[in-house]
């Protein structure tokens, strides 16, 4: 016997319809490529999304055709998010920071039919166009630009493209399991792999994000996603904010500290989301300009382990609560967020602060476990380290166009992380499996060493890698970037570890570099560092 309740499919079109119907006047401020600020609202986004959906449908695109973007966080990109998926096509957001060869591979592998792009990327698109085998239409995201039209034959313009559409377009009825968006993993080796999300997984992910003990956006929030919309759907923020009716600030291409502080103060941002490297610049600017970040109540930090010193500065200097989060492209990306339990209020304040440093617990919809090398489940005791496995409603089961290559083990996905879990489900990422340092049979967490190093006031940032050692197999090496105007030496930095970790875990050496090599999503390329410094202890 089935329950006697209505069935309505979980579709992305229902999110934008809800936002327009019940939160239509909620404002959205969008920084343009040129630097000006446009103001719209959810009703305006919904109208243009429908217009776009109607134009794409009338163009004769086959259902599930891929439509790509090379774009920053702005209102046109937000309209494309809903117009493409809502009309039954697949939104393919592409990271413009990839090498041109990777962009060509991704566009061709995805078999994209249309490419929307911001004016910033006109030279890039001009260069790769001859190598694109499936793209039929190129659309610059803006008004007509005759100079741009002269550079690319047949170039179309978004504002004209959408103006011909129908704001009364009816969204198609779709199976909720229909593919909605596509994102390729950044990967530090080999070609990127595609992760294909569904309408169902996206809406469920939004429900998960909006639970109070997760991120919990509300109609009273002004949300600024600094995480790019070309990276894992901006952590699902554009969808979750439509569900909650939050106002949004879309920061455009300039993510430097001065620009972000200005947006927070001007538009009274309450929640901002991004990776640690972004917040380093923002905090430095706030200190220099004397901004109190008065409106900001929460930062959500993921993409890499958040240094405890950063959490402390947000908390103690600005009264901002930091929600430490973890996830990955294969998880849409939400895996865990760190929110305290009721019992933690009885802990000493320092113990409460310490608890907030780990990656937190999964929301409903995600399950975690750790296993040993033989696949045996390990205890949740907060001490035992193992390979982290996940499963859930918004976790992939195969990569795009690689369905014949199984990646699950008994229904679980191996994340490639080494972690611990405690009895309450709080997770601490100890390292990536490939980055953990194996020294004399013991494991040393590079993340733990990095968190200590970046707390030193004379360092801008740092990475720790394992390098070959004639006796211990591997030993940790600290690769450091000096803060502007500072001149720390090796002895000073190594002494900073005293009393914070066991002596045998302290890095053997320090090398200084001008900048750390980063991949397209801002993560440190430790493989590059290992190759560069592999002989530093043996040469």
From Swiss-Prot:
Residues reported to bind ATP: 231, 303, 324-325, 329, 359, 417, 432, 523
Protein name: 3-methylmercaptopropionyl-CoA ligase
Highest taxon in the source lineage: Bacteria
Site (Plays an important role in catalysis): 523
Keyword ATP-binding annotated: yes
Regulation of activity: Activated by LiCl and NH(4)Cl. Inhibited by dimethylsulfoniopropionate (DMSP). MMPA concentrations above 2 mM relieve the DMSP inhibition and 80% of activity is regained at an MMPA concentration of 8 mM.
Consequence of gene disruption: Cells lacking this gene show a delayed growth on methylmercaptopropionate (MMPA).
SUPFAM superfamilies: Acetyl-CoA synthetase-like
Annotated metabolic or biological route of this protein: Lipid metabolism; fatty acid metabolism
Functional pH dependence: Optimum pH is between 7.5.
Xref: InterPro entries: AMP-bd_C, AMP-bd_C_sf, AMP-binding_CS, AMP-dep_synth/lig_dom, ANL_N_sf
Obligatory cofactor(s): Mg(2+)
Keywords noted in UniProt: ATP-binding, Fatty acid metabolism, Ligase, Lipid metabolism, Magnesium, Metal-binding, Nucleotide-binding
Complex and partners: Homodimer.
Positions with a binding annotation for Mg(2+): 185, 330
Cited function: Involved in the assimilation of dimethylsulphoniopropionate (DMSP), an important compound in the fixation of carbon in marine phytoplankton. Catalyzes the ATP-dependent ligation of methylmercaptopropionate (MMPA) and CoA to yield methylmercaptopropionate-CoA (MMPA-CoA). It is also active with short-chain-fatty-acid (carboxylic acids up to six carbons in length).
Enzyme class: ligase
EC number of the protein: 6.2.1.44
Source organism of the structure: Ruegeria pomeroyi (strain ATCC 700808 / DSM 15171 / DSS-3) (Silicibacter pomeroyi)
């Amino acid at each position: 016997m089935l329950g006697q309740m209505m069935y309505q499919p979980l579709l992305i079109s229902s999110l934008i319809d809800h936002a327009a119907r019940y939160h239509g006047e909620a404002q959205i401020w969008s920084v343009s490529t040129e630097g000006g600020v446009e103001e719209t609202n959810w009703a305006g986004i919904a109208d243009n999304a429908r217009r776009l959906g109607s134009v794409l449908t009338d163009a004769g695109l086959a259902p599930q055709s891929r439509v790509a973007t090379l774009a920053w966080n702005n209102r046109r990109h937000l309209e494309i998010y809903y117009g493409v998926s809502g009309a039954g096509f697949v939104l393919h957001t592409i990271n413009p920071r990839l090498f041109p060869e990777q962009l060509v591979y991704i566009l061709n592998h995805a078999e994209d039919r249309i490419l929307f792009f911001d004016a910033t990327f006109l030279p890039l698109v001009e260069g790769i166009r001859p190598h694109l085998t499936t793209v039929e239409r190129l659309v610059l995201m803006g008004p007509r630009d005759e100079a741009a039209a002269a550079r690319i034959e047949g170039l179309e313009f978004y504002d004209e493209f959408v103006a011909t559409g129908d704001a009364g377009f009816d969204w198609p009825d779709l199976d909720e399991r229909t593919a909605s968006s596509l994102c390729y993993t950044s990967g530090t080796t080999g070609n990127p792999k595609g992760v294909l999300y569904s309408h169902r997984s996206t809406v469920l992910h939004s429900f998960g994000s909006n639970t109070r003990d997760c991120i919990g956006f509300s109609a009273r929030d002004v949300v600024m996603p600094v995480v790019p919309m070309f990276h894992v759907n901006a952590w699902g923020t554009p969808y979750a904010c439509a569900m909650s009716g939050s106002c949004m600030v879309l920061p455009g291409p300039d993510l430097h500290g001065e620009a972000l502080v200005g947006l927070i103060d001007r538009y009274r941002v309450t929640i901002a989301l991004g990776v640690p490297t972004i917040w380093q610049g923002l905090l430095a600017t706030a200190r220099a300009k004397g901004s109190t970040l008065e409106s900001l109540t929460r930062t959500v930090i993921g993409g890499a382990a958040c240094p405890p010193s950063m959490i402390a500065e947000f908390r103690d200097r600005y009264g901002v609560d930091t929600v430490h989060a973890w996830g990955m492209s294969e998880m849409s990306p939400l895996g865990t967020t760190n929110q305290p339990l009721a019992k933690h209020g009885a802990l000493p304040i320092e113990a409460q602060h310490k608890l907030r440093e780990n990656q937190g617990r999964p929301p409903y919809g995600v399950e975690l476990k750790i296993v040993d090398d033989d696949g045996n489940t390990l205890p949740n005791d907060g001490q035992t380290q193992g390979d982290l496995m996940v499963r859930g409603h918004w976790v992939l089961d195969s990569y795009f166009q690689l369905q014949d290559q199984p990646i699950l083990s008994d229904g679980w996905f191996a994340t490639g992380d080494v972690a611990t879990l405690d009895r309450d489900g709080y997770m601490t990422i100890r390292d990536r499996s490939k980055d953990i340092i194996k020294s004399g049979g013991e494991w040393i967490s590079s993340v733990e060493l990095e968190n200590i190093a970046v707390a030193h006031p004379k360092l801008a940032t740092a990475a720790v890698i394992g390098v070959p050692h004639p006796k211990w197999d591997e030993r940790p090496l600290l690769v450091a970037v000096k803060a502007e105007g500072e001149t720390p030496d090796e002895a000073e930095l190594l002494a900073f570890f005293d009393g914070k970790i066991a002596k045998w875990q302290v890095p053997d050496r320090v090398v200084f570099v001008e900048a750390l090599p980063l991949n397209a999503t801002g993560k440190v390329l430790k493989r590059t560092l290992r190759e560069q410094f592999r002989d530093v202890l043996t040469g």
